[in-house]
C-alpha cells in the first residue's frame, strides 16, 4: 500500500463500525474493522501493528509454516489518526474460526485452560491439549502444529497465546476441520509500551519479566517440552540484512526508539535461538 505521509491516513474508516476483540486478548480490547475482504486493527497497547507486520514478514523466511500476512497501515476514524495493521481475511466462504477453548467447552462443558492448569508438567499439558483437539476435530499432527506455534511465540516473545488465541478452522460444507494459519502476534516483541514495557525501561528488565502462555510462564520451558515431544519444526532463513529490510518497510510510522528496540530484540533472539536459524543468524 502506498504511504501518503506521516500525518495522513492510508484509509478513512468513518463509515464503518468498529468491533472490539473482547475475549481474544489478555490485555483488553482492540478496535478492529472488517471492510470487504480485509481486516484493520488499531494499536491499543503500544506498537502492536509493527509487531504483527514484522513477525509476518520474517515468517516468510520459514519453511513449512502457514501464516497470515500483515501490512502496516495508518487509519483515520472520527478525525483521529491511528497506527495499526491490515490483513486479508483468511477464511473461505462457509468457514468459521473455532478457538480451542470454545471447541473444548462444546464437547465437555469445561474450560480447557482450567483443565490444562490442573495438570502437573509442561509436556503433560501439551500432550493433553493436543490429544483432546485431535480427538475432537479428527486432525492429525496437532502436536507438530502446536510446536511450530510455540517456537514462533518463543522467538518473537508473544505473550498472548492463551486458549482463546489458538484456533482451528471448521469447513461447514464439508463438516470437517483444517489447521489455521498462524495469526495474531500483536503482543509480541514487547509491544505493550502502555503498561508493562515502556520504551524507557531497560530491555534486560523487560526480557526478564515477559511471560509465555498457555502451558508455562517460561517460553523456553514450553519450547523445550514441545521439541522433546515433536522435534524442531521451524527453521528461519533470515539474517540481519533481511531484518533491516523488514524494519525499513514496516517501521515507517513508528519512532526511531521503537524500531531500535525491535531491532535489538530480534538480534538477541537470533543469537539465543541459533538452532532455529538456518545458517544466517
Place the predicted regions along the sequence by residue.
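Conserved ATP-binding subdomain of kinase catalytic cores across diverse folds
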Residues: 1-112
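C-terminal catalytic region of ATP-dependent kinase domains
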Residues: 43-44, 172-281
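Short helix-capping/linker segments at secondary-structure and domain boundaries
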Residues: 64-66, 160, 276
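Short coil/loop linkers at secondary-structure junctions
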Residues: 64-66, 140, 186, 253
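Short alpha-helical "patches" and their helix-cap loops
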Residues: 68-78, 162-172, 279-281
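ATP-dependent phospho-/nucleotidyl transfer catalytic cores
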Residues: 90-150, 249, 253-261, 265, ...
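Conserved kinase catalytic-core segment
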Residues: 125-191
